[in-house]
């Protein structure tokens, strides 16, 4: 799988589900990842966990991201994922949420290189699919290169590097100089990630760091246009921002996709956060938000969107 020159959607737990990923594909994202999936849950054949692996053909190239620490469990989970035929398998080495790290998962694996190697090799040796890793810079910024080289030596095909240390969550600035240094010291493709808020920043950071590709996460929330905008900026030196009409229309299509035209009531709750993201900054949006947060009626939601569009 060639990731050079490509833009990917970062995996975000509870957000980048199959519906959002498909919307991003409409606007040119090159490849996507599943949400964070527990290897332990796959090992136990948890139905809830396996639901997170669902994807559609239009999302390809698509990777399933897992987290875990036990080599045997990771190997078992990987063999089960092989049957689902994703395009690649990704190992999460970047999640710094306390409850994840406390159990030794995510960025906690970056503390002990021996355990890290065992975990990565267990996945690589259990599949013919490309294996990637999404990593942070470790617990010390100077360890980033060493970690990346370990992953390369273990047979990882490419890495996505978030430019923060494991303890910083999203505080401070993403260190793209360290990402650049990693790129200069490994032979596998490196994808840069962190603090890309605008197409201009995406292009600037991409060019300055010399990474092979970029990954966009939080900046895509309510703004799937950003992938097309980056590509337009590269190709034409300019891009267009969506009008209110376009924002409402894509949100409407997102609702239809996620709720199956209102049949999947449970997904109406999930869509509330997307409503807020898509329409952030719209005039008089507060009263519409209050209505959206109260209703589970699909027809009413469509009527609210129509009113927002007309009032714009």
Outline where the language-model segments fall.
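Flavin-dependent oxidoreductase catalytic cores
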Residues: 1-312
